Amino acid sequence: MQISKKMPSPKRTIKVLSALFIGIWLIFIGNGLVLTSAGVMLKEMGVSDVFIGIITSCFFLGGIMSAIFAYSFISSYGYVRSYAIFTALFAISATLHGLGNSIIYWAFLRFLLGFSYYSIVMVVESWINTKSKNEIRSRVLAFYEMLYYGGFGVGVIILALNLSNAKIFAISIFFILLGSIPMNTVKIKEPPLPEKRKLSIPNVFELVPLALSGSFTAGICLSSFFAMSSVFVLKTGGSVLDISAFIFIAMIGGLLSELFFGNFSDKFGRKYSIMLGVFIALVASFFMWFNLENLNILKICVFFLTFGTFSLYALSLARANDMLNNKNESAKVGAELLLSYSIGSLLGPLITGVFIEIFGSLGFVLVYVFILVFLFVFAAFQEVVPKEKRGEFVAKRPSKILR
């Protein structure tokens, strides 16, 4: 008698990891509030646009340091303890903002926020990857992506309440600490400790040039948006409510981007998907250029701006995997793409801050125009991967290497 093997179920996996998902959703809310409110607070403090760019870029510098050091921490202390420690550090970093207004002090705290937040995400995504079978991993990660956009959107809605700085930090800390409760109260079996590994930086530019260029561009576009979009809206004469609406609409565009380009790229290839996304974002950028005084048009344009750019990293990763002859090299390529994205994310706020200081609100748009034109032209001269050699597209933010 043949015994049928039970097929893995995404619903069952999500249910098993429900405490993890609830916790990270609450942390996404806190992070959305902390990240998007920075530009507004620094503007109120009288900080120049250049220094706002420098301070906010420290968040992404912390993310780079997390990619280097957090994995070995998880290998030593396990998932549950690492999650608790990094969540506590995240909450402490948010709390300390109320104790001083020094630029250097804020830059240091932003660094700690970035390090702790990305370390939390590394714990969660590594856990999800370990517990999800290959057949259902993309669907479990898609659910996780929905939580990210939903949580970040709630944080942005809270920002619209126009609260004082103290209340914003208090609410964000509340959600961050609340996010630590499910993991510490529900009995959940954590995965075995990951093996320790040496840090290595592979050299694969000759193999996946479009993927590396795409991930670098994604880093600049996404970090510039999250760090400087609030400053941009203020420069155009908008209010805190306008900032909230602007970012919330952008998040909807980003979510729909993941859904659309997954199917499109599987049918027509990553190169044409990257070019289409860049073209849509470029058209939106030019419309923004000529309508800087009209916030309603800007809110429509930002939907298409993020629709075209928020999937660039996932498309770049899919492109890289399509180009590989030896699939065992995918880990090294993933590390290279993450490094490329991280460098872009560090440079994005710095460049955008300088451009806004020089050109005003137009500077925000010019950064997108220049970098997107470069990527579009570069992509046009790259080869197309045949359909039979393409892998499955997985919606993925460039938060961490998933091992």
Role assignments for model-derived ranges:
Residues 327-357:
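A late C-terminal transmembrane helix in Major Facilitator Superfamily
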